[in-house]
Amino acid sequence: MSRSLKKGPYVEASLLKKVEELNQKNEKRVIKTWSRRSTIFPQFVGHTFAVHDGRKHIPVYVTEDMVGHKLGEFAPTRTFKGHAGSEKSSRLR
């Protein structure tokens, strides 16, 4: 279920403040964040965020196509190592 339109998009206030300060200074710097739930605003385009995946911070460079999505969508939390190998192939060798 999506968020109510009357509420508007959510973004962590401290994250928005950091981006606004960097935009005023014309700086590009990696912004470390744990806020995976924050919506990507148009002001974020061109910035790199280090989004926490539960273990480490994944660098995410924001483009125009990402506006409206959440930061957490671009930093996967699960790593798939693959299914166990077939026992038949290991027995034949």
Swiss-Prot record:
Pfam families tied to this protein: Ribosomal_S19
- Database matches in InterPro entries: Ribosomal_uS19, Ribosomal_uS19_bac-type, Ribosomal_uS19_CS, Ribosomal_uS19_SF
- Which UniProt keywords are given for this protein, alphabetically ordered? Ribonucleoprotein, Ribosomal protein, RNA-binding, rRNA-binding
Q: Which PROSITE patterns match?
A: RIBOSOMAL_S19
**Stretches of the chain forming a coiled coil according to its record:** none
Which residues are the signal sequence here? Answer: none
Q: What would be an example GO MF term here?
A: rRNA binding
Q: What does this protein do?
A: Protein S19 forms a complex with S13 that binds strongly to the 16S ribosomal RNA.
- Know the name of this protein? Small ribosomal subunit protein uS19
Q: Which organism is it from?
A: Heliobacterium modesticaldum (strain ATCC 51547 / Ice1)
The record's gene field reads rpsS
